[in-house]
C-alpha cells in the first residue's frame, strides 16, 4: 500500500504540474462556427434519420439555443419560420444527418498517454498522429518493431510502442528484447494497457532496480514483465509520460479522435485511472472548454480509484459531490458509479465458468466480491446508476446474483444497471438480464479481434465464435449500446457498428453468424439506445423537438450501403448543440 500511495502522490504531482504549465497549449479554439443563442436556424438535408418511431425520416430540422425546435420538411416548419424568422442553411442537402453518435465507455487519459508513441498492434489504427498498420504474426511484428526502434531519436526516453500481444506476436520477454536491442532502451506496452515488458537498457534508463520491486507479486523481474499492480512500480519512474507538453497534446489527440468518429457525447468510464481524479478532471475540463470541443464528456467515478487511495464509501460519496459541484458545459459528473468484476479480456484474465480456459489458467476478480457488493449496495441505495466491468460468463453470473441481492435489499424500478463489455455470456444469462431490468454496454470489437485467437487457444470454437452475443440481446429485447473503451477499440462508432452487423474477424472469418445484429439495432446502439443505456434519453439520442441539437453528418446512408461498406462511410463532421463542426478536409 505504501508503494501505491507513493505512486499516487507522484502522479498527482505530475498532473498538477501539467495543469499549471500546459494549459496555454490547449487553448486553441476548435474549428467551430459561432451562432447567436436566439437565432433560429433550419438545416436541410438529403435525409434526416431521426431514430424516432413516429417520424423516422425528415428533410429539415430547426434549432435554436442549442436545442431542436422542430423536425419535418421546410413546408411543415413554415409555422416556425414565418412567425419567428429563420436562416435556412442548405450545406447538408446532399448529406445524411443522424443523431449525434454516443460512445458510452472511453478513457480520455489513455489516448493522452498512448498517442505520444507509435502503435503496433494486431489491428490497423488510424489516428490524428498517423496511420499504423497492424502486424498479425511474430515475423511481421519483429520487422515492424525493428523499423520503428530505428526511427526513435529521443535518447532521453525509452522507445515505447503500444499494442503488443503474445497471442499474435509470440512471447517477448526481457532476454528476447536484450538480444534484439542490446543497446537501445525498449518497452512494449501490452494491447490491454495493463502490462509492460522492458529490456535491460530501458530499466537502466528509467532507474528501476530489482530492489524496487522485490516485494511486488505482479512483477517478474527476470522477464522484465510488469502487470496490473506491478505497473505502480514502473509508472513513477516514467515521468515523461506526464510531461506537460506531451500530455496536453495527447489530450488534444483524444478530442480529435472523438470528433473524427462523429461522437458528440462520450462517457469517461473510470475517472482517476492515474491516481489523481481531481487533477485529471480539471485537465479534461480545461482542454474541452478552452478548445470549445464539439462534444461533451460525462465522467464516471470508479471503485478502484477510491480503494487504491484508501477512501471509505462515505468519503467517496463526499468527494463525488465535490467534483459534481465543478460541472461545466462540456464536462460533468452525474449520478453513476462503476464497479469492477473480473479481469481484462485482452489479458486473458476474464472469469469463465466450466470448462474455463483450455490451458488451465484462471481469471481474476478485481476486488473480493464481498467488497464489490458492499460498495454496490451503498451507491445503489443512494440512487446511482451502476456500471459493472464484466467480461466472462462467471463474472456475468456473479453480477446477476449481485443485482438480485440489491433488488432484494432495496427494490428499485428502472435502475438500468449496465453490464459493461459483455465479452461472453450464455443465453440463459441474457434472459436473466432482461428479467432483472439490466442493460448492456458492449464492445463488439472484441469479437472482431479476439474471437479467432480465443477459439484456437483459450476457449474452443463454440464459445470463442459466440463472443459478444448481441444477436441474442436483440432477439430478447435487452437494451444495448456499443462502446469503444478507447483505445481497446477505435473510437469510431461506425467501426463498432460494422463489427456487430458483419461479425467478420480480423482474419476474415465469419463466425457466430446468428449473433449478428440488424443495421437498425446497430444504429440505435450508437444513438437512441445508447442514450437509454446511460439514462440521457430525454436529452440526446434521437432528433425530436426539445432534445439537444447534436447531429452526426454522413456522406452516405448506412441503411442503403452494403453492410460490408458501413465502416467506409465518410463522416463530414458533427453539429454540437446546433453549431456545425466540420472535420478538416484531410480527416474526411
Task: Give short role names for the model-derived ranges.
Residues 1-8:
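N-terminal secretory signal peptides that target proteins for export/translocation
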Residues 287-296, 321-330, 381-382, 404-415, ...:
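Secondary-structure transition/capping motifs at alpha-helix termini
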Amino acid at each position: 500500500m505504501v508503494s501505491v500511495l507513493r505512486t499516487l502522490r507522484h502522479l498527482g504531482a505530475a498532473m498538477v504540474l501539467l495543469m499549471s504549465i500546459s494549459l496555454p497549449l490547449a487553448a486553441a479554439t476548435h474549428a467551430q462556427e459561432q451562432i447567436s443563442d436566439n437565432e433560429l436556424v433550419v438545416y436541410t438535408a438529403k435525409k434526416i434519420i431521426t431514430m424516432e418511431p413516429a417520424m423516422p425520416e425528415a428533410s429539415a430540422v430547426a434549432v435554436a439555443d442549442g436545442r431542436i425546435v422542430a423536425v419535418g420538411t421546410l413546408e411543415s416548419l413554415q409555422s416556425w419560420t414565418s412567425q419567428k424568422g429563420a436562416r435556412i442553411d442548405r450545406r447538408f442537402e446532399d448529406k445524411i444527418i443522424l443523431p449525434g453518435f454516443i460512445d458510452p465507455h472511453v478513457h480520455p487519459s489513455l489516448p493522452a498517454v498512448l498517442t505520444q508513441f507509435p502503435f503496433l498492434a494486431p489491428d490497423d489504427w488510424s489516428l490524428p498522429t498517423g496511420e499504423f498498420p497492424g502486424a498479425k504474426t511474430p515475423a511481421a511484428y519483429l520487422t515492424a518493431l525493428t523499423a520503428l526502434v530505428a526511427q526513435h531519436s529521443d535518447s532521453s526516453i525509452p522507445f515505447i510502442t503500444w499494442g503488443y500481444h503474445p497471442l499474435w506476436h509470440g512471447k517477448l520477454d526481457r532476454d528476447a528484447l536484450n538480444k534484439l536491442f542490446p543497446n537501445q532502451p525498449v518497452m512494449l506496452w501490452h494491447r490491454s494497457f495493463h502490462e509492460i515488458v522492458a529490456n535491460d537498457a530501458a530499466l537502466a534508463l528509467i532507474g528501476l532496480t530489482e530492489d524496487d520491486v522485490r516485494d511486488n507479486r505482479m512483477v517478474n523481474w527476470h522477464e522484465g514483465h510488469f502487470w496490473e499492480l506491478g505497473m505502480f512500480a514502473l509508472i513513477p519512474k516514467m515521468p515523461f509520460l506526464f510531461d506537460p507538453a506531451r500530455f496536453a497534446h495527447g489530450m488534444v489527440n483524444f478530442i480529435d479522435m472523438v470528433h473524427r468518429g462523429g461522437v458528440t457525447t462520450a462517457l469517461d468510464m473510470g475517472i482517476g485511472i492515474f491516481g489523481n481524479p481531481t487533477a485529471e478532471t480539471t485537465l479534461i475540463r480545461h482542454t474541452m472548454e478552452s478548445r470549445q470541443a464539439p462534444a461533451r464528456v460525462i465522467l464516471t467515478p470508479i471503485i478502484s480509484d477510491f480503494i487504491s487511495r484508501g477512501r471509505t464509501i462515505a468519503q467517496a460519496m463526499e468527494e463525488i459531490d465535490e467534483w459534481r459541484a465543478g460541472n461545466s458545459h462540456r464536462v460533468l459528473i452525474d449520478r453513476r458509479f462503476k464497479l469492477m468484476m473480473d479481469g481484462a479480456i485482452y489479458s486473458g484474465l476474464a472469469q469463465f465458468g466450466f470448462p474455463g480456459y483450455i490451458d488451465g489458467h484462471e481469471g481474476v476478480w478485481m476486488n473480493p466480491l464481498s467488497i464489490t457488493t458492499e460498495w454496490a449496495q451503498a451507491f445503489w441505495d443512494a440512487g446511482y446508476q451502476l456500471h459493472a466491468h464484466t467480461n466472462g460468463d462467471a463474472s456475468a453470473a456473479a453480477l446477476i446474483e449481485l443485482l438480485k441481492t440489491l433488488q432484494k435489499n432495496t427494490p428499485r424500478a428502472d435502475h438500468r444497471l449496465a453490464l459493461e463489455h459483455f465479452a461472453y455470456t450464455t443465453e440463459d444469462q441474457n434472459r436473466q438480464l432482461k428479467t432483472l431490468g439490466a442493460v448492456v454496454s458492449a464492445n463488439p470489437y472484441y469479437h472482431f479481434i479476439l474471437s479467432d485467437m480465443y477459439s484456437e487457444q483459450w476457449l474452443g470454437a463454440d464459445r470463442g465464435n459466440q463472443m459478444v452475443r448481441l444477436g441474442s440481446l436483440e432477439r430478447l429485447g435487452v437494451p444495448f449500446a456499443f462502446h469503444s473503451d478507447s483505445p481497446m477499440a477505435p473510437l469510431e462508432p461506425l467501426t463498432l457498428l460494422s463489427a456487430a452487423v458483419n461479425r467478420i474477424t480480423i482474419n476474415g472469418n465469419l463466425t457466430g453468424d446468428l449473433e449478428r445484429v440488424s443495421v437498425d439495432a446497430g444504429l440505435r446502439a450508437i444513438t437512441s439506445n445508447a442514450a437509454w443505456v446511460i439514462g440521457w434519453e430525454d436529452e440526446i439520442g434521437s432528433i425530436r423537438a426539445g432534445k439537444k441539437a447534436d447531429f452526426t453528418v454522413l456522406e452516405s446512408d448506412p441503411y442503403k450501403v452494403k453492410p460490408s461498406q458501413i465502416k467506409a462511410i465518410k463522416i463530414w463532421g458533427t453539429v454540437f448543440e446546433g453549431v456545425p463542426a466540420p472535420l478538416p478536409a484531410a480527416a474526411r
